[in-house]
């Protein structure tokens, strides 16, 4: 089996395993599957769970797509790939829970390969996971980062610190001067050693459930009211802003003629903006700002 097919098989299995775990955690709703094809090449399967007991919407998509010309979002920082054919596969998910005390989360793992005249000229892995709480708890954030740190250990002493820092820098809303959440791991252009890099991708993909599901179980029965719900919807607006303004994956998908429904499944089903909103000083809502700056959560 060639390298691309090995990655592809892992990713389809990962999607299946995460769906099964999320359905078990929700206990009510199940994923609906939408199979699709892309005219230029490839396709995928998008799965959406809606109106569950725990999750308002959970989307997880697998795609395997190809093309004859790289979109600007991909070739801008790799001009030597202009004119190359390409193929990319990945799994991407975003979960939006009902309860404002359960954080929203995102995970993505992907593999990209470019060829010219039948020769592979570039290949790399990318991905990571990050957490976006609305009412954060130190124990949840520390658990999230402990899992991230542990899965990085076999890949070198500096791996966690480097990819945590990359996550903090990538998921940053410059126009708001705040991070999207409390971070996690982020990496891209990882292509020095296929076996080692593929092992790291698997560690990230497999570690996601260990990082997230215990937080869901801990917070899913926390009582909340209209105030918390309104704040959750307001903060979801930041999520939308990041995905539509900064996210390279969203831009790549749209610029490459990708399937808009699948690309935009990351957006929350309900969201609101409020002009000039400022949380009451000393409130639980105001406390969130202390978490939206890069920090050493395990120090």
From Swiss-Prot:
Q: Tell where it localizes.
A: Cytoplasm
In this chain's numbering, which residues are marked as the site (Important for dimerization)? Answer: 175
- Please write the reaction equations for the catalytic activity of this protein: coproporphyrinogen III + O2 + 2 H(+) = protoporphyrinogen IX + 2 CO2 + 2 H2O
Classification via InterPro entries: Coprogen_oxidase_aer, Coprogen_oxidase_aer_sf, Coprogen_oxidase_CS
> What's the top EC group for this one?
oxidoreductase
Q: What is its EC number?
A: 1.3.3.3
Q: Which GO terms describe its biological process?
A: protoporphyrinogen IX biosynthetic process
Renumbered to this chain, region (Important for dimerization) spans: 239-274
Per its UniProt record, the required cofactor names are:
a divalent metal cation
What are the GO cellular component annotations? cytoplasm
Q: What is its main location?
A: cytoplasm
> Which residues are listed for a divalent metal cation binding in this entry?
96, 106, 145, 175
- Keyword match Membrane: no
Task: Could you list this entry's UniProt keywords, alphabetically sorted.
Answer: Cytoplasm, Heme biosynthesis, Metal-binding, Oxidoreductase, Porphyrin biosynthesis
**Active site, renumbered:** 106
**HAMAP family referenced in this protein's UniProt entry, alphabetically:** Coprogen_oxidas
The record's family statement is:
Belongs to the aerobic coproporphyrinogen-III oxidase family.
On subunit structure and binding partners, the annotation says: Homodimer.
Q: What does this protein do?
A: Involved in the heme biosynthesis. Catalyzes the aerobic oxidative decarboxylation of propionate groups of rings A and B of coproporphyrinogen-III to yield the vinyl groups in protoporphyrinogen-IX.
Descriptive protein name: Oxygen-dependent coproporphyrinogen-III oxidase
Give the source species. Answer: Xanthomonas axonopodis pv. citri (strain 306)
